[in-house]
């Protein structure tokens, strides 16, 4: 019975760690992505973030509400 609890705890920890996006904090820029579906075809968001001395960026959000987010670390 104890081994089942330990196994469950380890699986739970792995699930949390896999969704944590290690080393990737995201900074909201307030810049709306041009495509309503969040596709940064011209790489404008990434270029903006690189020019602001971040590690890059991408469009994050949901339909018609995608915003540019820059990556840190």
Curated annotation (Swiss-Prot):
Q: Which residues form a coiled coil?
A: none
Keywords of this entry: Antimicrobial, Disulfide bond, Fungicide, Plant defense, Secreted, Signal
Signal peptide bounds: 1-25
User: Which cysteines are cross-linked by disulfides?
Assistant: 33-59, 45-68, 49-70
**Does the keyword field hold Ion transport?**
no
Q: Where in the cell is it found?
A: Secreted
Single GO biological process annotation from the record: defense response to fungus
Listed GO CC annotations: extracellular region
Tell me where on the tree of life, at the top rank, the source sits: Eukaryota
Query: What family is this?
Result: Belongs to the DEFL family.
Q: What is this protein called?
A: Defensin-like protein 34
Q: Which organism is it from?
A: Arabidopsis thaliana
């Amino acid at each position: 019975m104890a081994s089942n609890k330990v196994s469950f705890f380890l699986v739970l920890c792995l699930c949390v760690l896999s969704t944590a996006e290690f080393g990737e904090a995201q900074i909201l820029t307030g810049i709306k992505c041009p495509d309503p579906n969040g596709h940064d075809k011209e790489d404008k968001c990434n270029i903006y973030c690189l020019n602001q001395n971040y590690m890059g960026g991408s469009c994050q959000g949901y339909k018609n509400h995608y915003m540019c987010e820059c990556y840190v670390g």
